[in-house]
Structure formats: structure tokens, C-alpha cells
């Protein structure tokens, strides 16, 4: 299920900070990202640059502290959002396809996933349930990762999003001043 993103305080907050978040992501080279660890679920090159996790047991948590030093403004923005569990940049290189899957097995059963487009192209998109969407720079998509979804970048430029997992109960919470 896709959620109507603009109504939530954290979405307005993230979108207001789009320029500095995009600028920090743009400083990263493809080599700075790690391959998404579950390699049997995709073809092509899906990479992640994790910089925040509240759960040290999460399989990407070890990379967060050193990575956070490379994106201090983005980390500061994300840390102010109530209910954030983890965050990072997700990179799909051209020709990448992520097969249909559900995220519940990855420990996000009670979380929603937010993607804020940073760089994309018209041939990059995602299907959640029966709805297909594409990423627009500076705009957020929120979806329930427990619902079947898939993604692809069939274009000729990389797709980069800020990926934030947030507790469902915190969606309406205002950002502290």
C-alpha cells in the first residue's frame, strides 16, 4: 500500500531539506556504497549507503558510524524525526531489477518505508501491490514494505533515493523545534 506522503510532518521536513540531502548524496561515489546483502533478490547492481540505525543487530548497522561522517547534514535531519529506525541512500544502477518481495522478514514488520527521490530517470520505477510509481527528486513516497513490491531502473542513469524506515505510530508526530 502506498500512503499519501505530503500530509505527514516528517515528509514536509525531509522535502524542505532536499537540497542539502541531495548535495551530500551527490558527493558519494558508487564505490562508497555497499552491495545490498541479499543478492539472490535482484539482478544488476543495487547498493546501499547506510548511515543511521537504532538497532545495532541490523545486518547493515556496522557500516553506519563510519558512513555517517560523510553525510553529517543528512544525519542531523534524520535524527530529528521521531520514530526513525534506520536510514541510508539506496542506489539502483542502470539495468537493475529487484524481484517482487516483502520486507517483513528483514525486521521492519511495524515500520513504513519512505523513499525521497534524489536522482532518477523516467525509466526507473517501483510497484507496490497493484500500483506503479516513479521517484521524483525532492518528493517522498511512503509504502508498507510488508506488501509485495518490486523496483527497476531501466534507464541509462542511476536512481538514488534517501531510504528511511519509520514507526507507523510516529507518522503524525511533529518535528521538535
Residue ranges and their predicted role:
Residues 1-111, 121-124, 158, 173-177:
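Fe(II)/2-oxoglutarate oxygenase catalytic core
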Residues 100, 117-137:
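A short beta-strand-loop-beta hairpin characteristic of the jelly-roll/cupin
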Residues 132-136, 147-168, 176:
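Acidic/histidine-enriched, beta-strand-rich ligand/metal-binding domains
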Residues 98-101, 125-126, 143, 149-155:
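Short beta-strand His + acidic residue motifs that chelate non-heme Fe in jelly-roll/DSBH
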Residues 111-117, 140-142, 157-173:
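A short hydrophobic beta-strand segment most commonly corresponding to one strand
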Amino acid at each position: 500500500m502506498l500512503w499519501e506522503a505530503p500530509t505527514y510532518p516528517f515528509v514536509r521536513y525531509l522535502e524542505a531539506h532536499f537540497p542539502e540531502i541531495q548535495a551530500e548524496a551527490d558527493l558519494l561515489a558508487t564505490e562508497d556504497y555497499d552491495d545490498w546483502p541479499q543478492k539472490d533478490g535482484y539482478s544488476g547492481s543495487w547498493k546501499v549507503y547506510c548511515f543511521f540505525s537504532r538497532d545495532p543487530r541490523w545486518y547493515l548497522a556496522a557500516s553506519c558510524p563510519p558512513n555517517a561522517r560523510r553525510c553529517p547534514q543528512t544525519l542531523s535531519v534524520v535524527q530529528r524525526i521521531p520514530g526513525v529506525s534506520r536510514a541510508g541512500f539506496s542506489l539502483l544502477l542502470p539495468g537493475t531489477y529487484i524481484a517482487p518481495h516483502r520486507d517483513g522478514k528483514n525486521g521492519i514488520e511495524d515500520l513504513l518505508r519512505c523513499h525521497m527521490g534524489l536522482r532518477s530517470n523516467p525509466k526507473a520505477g517501483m510497484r507496490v501491490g497493484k500500483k506503479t510509481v516513479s521517484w521524483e527528486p525532492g518528493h517522498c513516497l511512503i509504502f508498507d514494505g510488508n506488501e509485495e513490491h518490486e523496483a527497476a531502473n531501466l534507464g541509462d542513469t542511476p536512481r538514488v533515493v534517501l531510504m528511511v524506515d519509520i514507526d507507523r505510530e510516529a507518522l503524525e508526530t511533529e518535528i521538535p523545534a
